Regions:
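Bacterial N-terminal signal peptides that target proteins for export
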Residues: 1-11
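N-terminal signal peptide c-region/cleavage motif recognized by signal peptidases
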Residues: 17-19
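GGW-centered surface loops in extracellular recognition modules
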Residues: 24-54, 221-225
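Aromatic-lined ligand-binding clefts that engage carbohydrates, nucleic acids, or primary amines
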Residues: 38, 61, 83, 91, ...
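Surface-exposed, low-complexity/disordered Ser/Thr/Gly/Pro/Asn-rich loops and linkers
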Residues: 54-90
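Exoplasmic/lumenal beta-rich domain surfaces
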Residues: 119-160
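Short beta-strand-plus-loop segments that form exposed binding edges in beta-rich domains
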Residues: 176-185
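Phosphate-handling architecture centered on phosphoinositide signaling
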Residues: 188-252
Length: 252
């Protein structure tokens, strides 16, 4: 079987994407756990318009350990039955410049929208991107949480180009609104984690959850790989095949 020029290029891109990722990320740490202390607002009315911003004063909000919700036995803070819930927590970044990837792990019932320092970064199962759902908006469909059943949370992966303008060294805020899918819904879950891909050997945060899986492969943007292009020129322009040896020169 012959290896076409297109296949060779695809192989090289995949290979150098992996190598570049390995060089960019030294290790992963987790800066937010689901069980951290969160400020929360039960959605019986609309929250303050600035509720997701770092500058918002949460003194009038309740406080509790996440997850926050009811039923399913995956909640550390129990709340009354509700159509929506708003939660937020601050976290401190020692040096934002060494953070190259961020992973938001989300385990929820039934829908959510997440904001980083007031800017939407992820949503699932509700509404239109960029439009904040009102407190009385229901999820598009039913969605069950996974962790309490032995499953894994969903992951939302962001490279540096996507979050660089959103974070800074010092205090930052992760804010999330969670919505049920019907007035009679029997449960609500809100378990969220935030993990960081760090480019140096500094250790300023916490170990990753045991189930955490660092992103690899196509989830890593080739735009982040600052490596030279490898050019292979075969002798007499012979097409590369799988088995026969081919005399070639590799150059940059």
């Amino acid at each position: 079987m012959k290896l076409s020029k297109k296949s060779l290029i695809t192989f090289l891109l995949a290979f150098y994407s992996f190598i570049g990722y390995a060089q960019v990320i030294d290790h992963w740490e987790t800066v937010i756990y689901n069980t951290d202390q969160w400020s929360y607002f039960v959605g019986n009315s609309e929250p303050n318009a600035n509720w997701a911003n770092t500058s918002f004063n949460t003194s009038s909000w309740s406080k509790g350990s996440g997850g926050i919700g009811y039923e399913d036995e995956d909640d550390n803070t129990i709340i009354p039955q509700t159509r929506s819930l708003y939660i937020r927590t601050n976290f401190t970044l020692v040096d934002a410049s060494v953070i190259k990837y961020i992973v938001l792990n989300a385990d929820y019932d039934d829908a959510f929208v997440a904001y980083l320092n007031g800017t939407e970064i992820a949503r699932s199962n509700i509404g239109t991107v960029g439009v904040r759902p009102s407190y009385n908006t229901y999820a598009d469909t039913y969605h069950e949480a996974n962790l309490y059943q032995g499953g894994l949370p969903e992951d939302y992966i962001f490279n540096e180009a996507e979050f660089k303008s959103l974070i800074s060294s010092g205090t930052n805020t992760l804010a999330i609104q969670i919505h049920n899918n019907s007035p009679s819904s029997s449960d609500l879950s809100s378990n969220f984690f935030l993990s960081l891909g760090i480019s140096d050997q500094s250790k300023n945060y916490r170990e990753n959850p045991s189930w955490f899986q660092a992103p690899t492969g196509p989830q890593v943007s080739l735009l982040d790989v600052k490596l030279p292009i490898v050019v292979i020129t075969t002798e007499n322009n012979i097409e590369i095949q799988n088995e026969p040896k081919v005399t070639a020169q590799m150059g940059i």
